[in-house]
Design a protein with these regions (language model features):
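Bacterial N-terminal signal peptides that target proteins for export
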Residues: 2-11
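Glycan-processing catalytic domains of CAZymes
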Residues: 14, 26-334
Length: 334
């Protein structure tokens, strides 16, 4: 599961020139014999430590991390606790329902039981648990939310995996838990919106004004609109809820896949023979996306540690946090 629903509608062609480690960043030494689960946990912990050293209230929500919460021969209890400590929230897609060619089917009872057991760990530690199911009919949407509410989760539903529009409730009002409180941590959010593809909006201003008009406690969006990152003024505008109170604005950041439309991608990499060794297999479901050996020092330097690194750009723009996607990439390397 991942969130590669990204826009190419205005994305300019960026050819990265390489990112160099600054004196303010000290990623761990690259693993010689990596244990995939532990390396993803370590990456999340390092990103958290780095971000919070720059901005102590910075929030991180991980997507697809449920499997990393299970103690196994490869994932120790210490690593599980490290992950729980590193992240402020955990999101899981298709938690209660599966999308089967547009038809909603209940999640397998055994899988649901497993997911609930895994989410009990961060929930007990006071971390936010979010769910995202892809549903279209009102009756199933209501049931999905009731299931989440009964477990203390915060649930969002979307009509499609494109995540390209604001739900009708966000436009017309009436979202669950709508409030005018100041939200400073993800665990305080009573609702959230994830919108990663702004291609349906007529312009940058239309996109920003539409988001600003929604009443959500937290919104997850892309760092970029077209070929330019959002500015600190853009983010500050989005941090105010129209009904009063402050909300959280989180930026999307993939930690398990690279994409050929991101600014770090170099032109030479379009030829598979020239790709660095840390770029692994292509994601056939999302053309232009590639699983990465995320323990690589080169990939880590792309993610954080210099002025042009991805997380540093997010921090500079004033985002309240980052949404770490493709945390289940460890499964590729088992």
């Amino acid at each position: 599961m991942n969130f590669h629903r990204f826009f190419r509608f205005l994305v300019g062609t960026f050819f990265g020139t390489g990112l160099f480690l600054s004196s303010g960043c000290t990623p761990s030494a690259e693993a010689v014999h990596p244990v995939p689960e532990q390396e993803m946990t370590r990456l999340a912990a390092d990103l958290s430590g780095y971000a919070k050293s720059k901005s102590p209230t910075f929030q991180l929500v991980g997507n697809g991390a449920a499997g990393l919460l299970e103690v196994t021969d490869s994932q120790t209890e210490e690593s599980v606790q490290q992950l729980v400590g590193a992240l402020d929230g955990f999101l899981t897609e298709s938690f209660f329902y599966l999308d089967d060619d547009g038809k909603s089917e209940p999640q397998d009872p055994g899988v649901l039981e497993y997911l609930e057991a895994m989410m009990e760990k961060p929930q007990t530690a006071g971390k936010a648990v979010w769910t995202l199911d892809y549903l279209a009919d009102d009756e199933t949407v209501a049931m999905d939310r009731a299931l989440g509410r009964a477990r203390g989760y915060v649930s969002m539903t979307a009509a499609s995996t494109g995540l390209a529009s604001i739900p009708d409730e966000g436009v017309m009002g009436g979202i669950p838990g709508e409030n005018a409180a100041d939200i400073t941590e993800v665990r305080g959010a009573r609702n959230f919106l994830i919108l990663l593809n702004p291609g349906n909006f007529a312009s940058r201003e239309d996109y920003l004004s539409s988001l600003a008009a929604t009443p959500y406690d937290a919104i997850v969006i892309d760092l970029y609109y077209g070929d330019a990152p959002l500015t600190s003024d853009d983010v500050a505008r989005l941090q105010q809820k129209p009904q009063g109170g402050r909300r959280l604005v989180l930026a999307y950041m993939s930690v398990g896949e690279a994409a050929d439309y991101r600014p770090y991608w170099q032109a030479s990499w379009n030829d598979s023979a020239n790709r660095p060794k840390w770029i692994a297999s292509a994601n056939d479901n999302w053309p232009g996306s590639y699983r990465v050996r995320y323990w690589s020092g080169d990939w880590r330097r792309i993610l954080y540690g210099s002025e042009d690194a991805y997380l540093d750009t997010i921090l500079a723009a004033g985002f309240d946090g980052a949404f770490l996607d493709v945390m289940d990439a460890w499964q590729t390397f088992k």
